[in-house]
Amino acid sequence: MNTDAQSTSNTRNFMYSPDSSLEVVIITNSDGDHDGYLELTAAAKVMSPFLSNGSSAVWTNAAPSHKLIKNNKNYIHVFGLFKYLSNYNLNNKKRPKEYYTLKSIISDLLMGAQGKVFDPLCEVKTQLCAIQESLNEAISILNVHSNDAAANPPAPDINKLQELIQDLQSEYNKKITFTTDTILENLKNIKDLMCLNK
């Protein structure tokens, strides 16, 4: 168990989400060789979706060489984090946000510095860009459909069908008129016959 670093070490805070600042210790052994440790309670919180038997097991199950105690705080080495991420089922398409946070933490601890500093407005900007992109696509699709409708008159087949329907309607109206006239004439004849019989 490491109680103090034999090389250069410093405690830093890495930002990964709007409400979480994670305390880390970076030990620089030589140029390009770093050992990164994450504070235990932060590690347990980030890894909670991957833990089956609770957060206390993180410290208990860590190898002695993966433990660091500094300023009365417990830290776990980046290799100890790998163990939990390696057990995650990658076939699960709906991944918790902690999955991505843990991957970023592991990457940053291996490099010895935070690679991509969290921008609190980044997610909002990304969502606004996605909304704007969707709106632009919808507008362009509507414009294409509108231009197609204005530029393309109805197809000749549709015009022929419309003429046929109008002809059939006209013919039907004539037949109805003829039938109605015939019925009225027959009624008049029946009435006349009835009047004559009286």
Swiss-Prot record:
> Which domain of life does the UniProt lineage start with?
Viruses
Alphabetic keyword roster:
Capsid protein, Host cytoplasm, Host nucleus, Late protein, Virion
A single Pfam family, by name? Baculo_p24
The answer to keyword Heme applying to this record is: no
Keyword check for Transcription regulation: no
The protein's matches in InterPro entries, at most eight in alphabetical order, are given as:
Baculo_p24 (IPR007765)
State a GO cellular component annotated for this protein: viral capsid
Where does the record say this protein resides? Answer: Virion; Host cytoplasm; Host nucleus
Chief location bin = virion
Q: Quote the record's miscellaneous comment.
A: Expressed late in infection.
Which family does the similarity line name? Belongs to the baculoviridae p24 family.
| Protein's name according to its UniProt entry | Capsid protein p24
